[in-house]
Amino acid sequence: MDRQTALACAGAVAALLVSGVAVGADVAAGRAKALMCQACHGMDGLSKVPEAPSIAGQTESYLAAQLQAFRAGTRKNETMNVVTSTLSDADVANLAAYFSAIEIKVVKVPGE
């Protein structure tokens, strides 16, 4: 590998690390794991209960950080602290990849 190619590869890896994108996250595995999320967040990432936020289309790095914080107990929510306690690092990455990959459409309601 020549110097220019090596520098380009190093730059690409650095950009991925800085962006917080989980390299190798599996959207399909995230969808399978999301079955445990559907009662509150829905399989489409759109909230089913007032207490749960809609998470569809949120950035992958944000979702992963929040799941990690709930799992570590640094972010407090009784339900989420319990639900995330059994998640592996791969589960967190996969769930974040799945919910961030959901495309949402914003529609303006007439009269608003």
PLM segments and residue spans:
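N-terminal signal peptide c-region/cleavage motif recognized by signal peptidases
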Residues: 18-20
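Cleavable N-terminal signal peptides
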Residues: 11-12, 22-23
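Flexible coil segments in periplasmic/lumen-exposed cytochrome c-class electron-transfer proteins
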Residues: 25-34, 43-46, 75-78, 82-112
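A structural feature that tracks compact, well-ordered secondary-structure segments
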Residues: 51-54, 64-71, 81-85
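Sequence context surrounding c-type heme c attachment/ligation sites in exported
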Residues: 24-38, 56-65
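Bacterial N-terminal signal peptides that target proteins for export
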Residues: 1-10
